[in-house]
Amino acid sequence: MPRRREVPKRYVLPDPKYNSKLAAKFINNLMRRGKKSLAEHVLYGALDLIEQRSKQDPLDLFHKAMENVRPVVEVKSRRVGGATYQVPVEVRHERRDALAMRWIINYAKQRTEKTMIQRLAGELQDAAQNRGGSVKKREDTHRMAEANKAFAHYRW
């Protein structure tokens, strides 16, 4: 966190195929070692596979999956007088998207399908239908915040 001035926000250009900023950010999150064309291939392949399987607009399903995984509240550790409390705090909009993308990608990697395209397609379809590991992670996060609601007055 800079002390002198606020760092200007970098804006991501929309992706070439769907013209979606969210898809472009997802590609950047999916990318490893600078291999952007490979990350694009994986996401576009997953969205094409979703279109073949469900006969729905894949971008709508992608947005629905993201909406179902975005957390509203999370807990942050706060030390007060020798004790550490898990304090529930509201999640900023940018962080909601970042967490949702991270969770979808991580739980897609843990799936048992053969290729990453199939894993990502499966996780996105599950998330759009409110099931799957990434949705469970969001529910666990919300449950933790609900359980620690008593410490909400320690917010900063």
From Swiss-Prot:
Organismal lineage: Bacteria, Pseudomonadati, Thermodesulfobacteriota, Syntrophobacteria, Syntrophobacterales
Role played: One of the primary rRNA binding proteins, it binds directly to 16S rRNA where it nucleates assembly of the head domain of the 30S subunit. Is located at the subunit interface close to the decoding center, probably blocks exit of the E-site tRNA.
Listed NCBIfam families: rpsG_bact
GO biological process: translation
Matches recorded under Pfam families: Ribosomal_S7
A single GO molecular function term of this UniProt record: structural constituent of ribosome
Protein name: Small ribosomal subunit protein uS7
Family note: Belongs to the universal ribosomal protein uS7 family.
One of the record's GO cellular component terms: small ribosomal subunit
Keywords carried by this UniProt record: Ribonucleoprotein, Ribosomal protein, RNA-binding, rRNA-binding, tRNA-binding
Entry-linked InterPro entries: Ribosomal_uS7, Ribosomal_uS7_bac/org-type, Ribosomal_uS7_CS, Ribosomal_uS7_dom, Ribosomal_uS7_dom_sf
Subunit structure: Part of the 30S ribosomal subunit. Contacts proteins S9 and S11.
Transmembrane segments: none
